[in-house]
Amino acid sequence: TTKAISIGSKVDEGDTVVTEKKTYARLKFSDGGEVTLKPNSQFQVDKYNYDEGKPGDDTAMFSLIKGGLRTITGQIGKRLNPDSYQMKTPTAVLGVRGTIYDAHFCQGNSCGSIAPGLYLAVTNGSVVITNTSGIQTTLQVKAGQYVYVQNPTTPPVVLPAKPDIPFNPPPKVGAAAAGPAGGPQ
C-alpha cells in the first residue's frame, strides 16, 4: 500500500514510500538500519523481520522502484546470514556485507544527462550485485568502488570514477528519534 507518512509514522511490510520533489525521507529500522530516500524516489518494504534473540529469522527485503537512496545496514546482514538482506532494483539485486551505500536508479532524465540505469557507490563494507535477468552476473563491490548496471540483461560494470549524481540530504531529516521496537519507521 502507499500512504502519506509524517515524523514518527510506522511503515509496514508491503508499504511503499514515495518522496516528492525537494523532499527527503529517513526510515529507521528496529535492527539499527537506516534508509534515506532522495527526492522523487519510490521505495517498498517487501519483507522485514528482526528479533534480537533469533538471528536465524532475520529478513530485510526491500525494493528501490524509482529514484535513489543511501542506506546504512543494521544488524540484519551483519549477523548469522548476510544473505538475509536484499535490495531489489529494476536492473539488479543488491546484497550487503556490513555496508553503507548509495543506489540511484536513473530513468528518463531523472539524473540529468547521466545515462539511464542503476548506479551504486559503496562507502563502507561491500555489496554483492547481480543483474535481474536469467544471465547470472555477480560482482562484489568494495568500499570506494562505483558500479553501473544499464539494464537487466547487462552485467555490472565498475566505473573509473564516481558518477555526477548529487545526493545532499539535509543533516537532519525530520526528527532523529528512534522508532518503535517493531518494524521500520
Language-model regions, residue ranges each:
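Flexible, surface-exposed loop/linker segments and immediately adjacent secondary-structure boundaries
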Residues: 1-24, 29-146, 150-185
